[in-house]
Amino acid sequence: MDIQKIREDFPILSRTVYGKPLVYFDNGATTQKPRLVVDALVDEYYSVNANVHRGVHYLSQQATELHEASRETVRQFINAGRTNEVVFTRGTTESINLLVSSFGDEFMQEGDEVILSVMEHHSNIVPWQLLAARKGIAIKVIPMNDKGELLLDEYEKLFTERTKIVSVVQVSNVLGTVNPVKEM
């Protein structure tokens, strides 16, 4: 993997901050865009900027077709069964809030458990805390070692018959740790 080539795809990463190349880890809040995405957004604003699924005029229909075509592309990329399984949100925070307010409110009951890691972004802690206050669920936390790695043996001990969901960051925007989510 050529990291320099990947960085070159992201115009903003050509900047320096305090005399050093920009490194950006806060992708849960806003993800930097590669040139291809920036160009597509500019093209959208110049040629088909209209409400999706909200109009019968030409631009709205064209914008809707492009929107749904992108949903199909994402469906194929993540190997989803149907396009209605792909939900677009503005970012991780909104996605987690949607998960908690749909799955959590509907399917979790007092005494049920969610497992998080000690390295979670605030956006993956607060919604679960609010759900715990509303519904009496328990939040369990996976500890980590001095190297910033999750303790997987401790993680396995957290599971009970009341565990309903595990919500763990794959790559920590604070530590840079890549968690072994496939193994988890």
Predicted regions mapped to residue ranges:
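Pyridoxal 5′-phosphate
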Residues: M1-M184
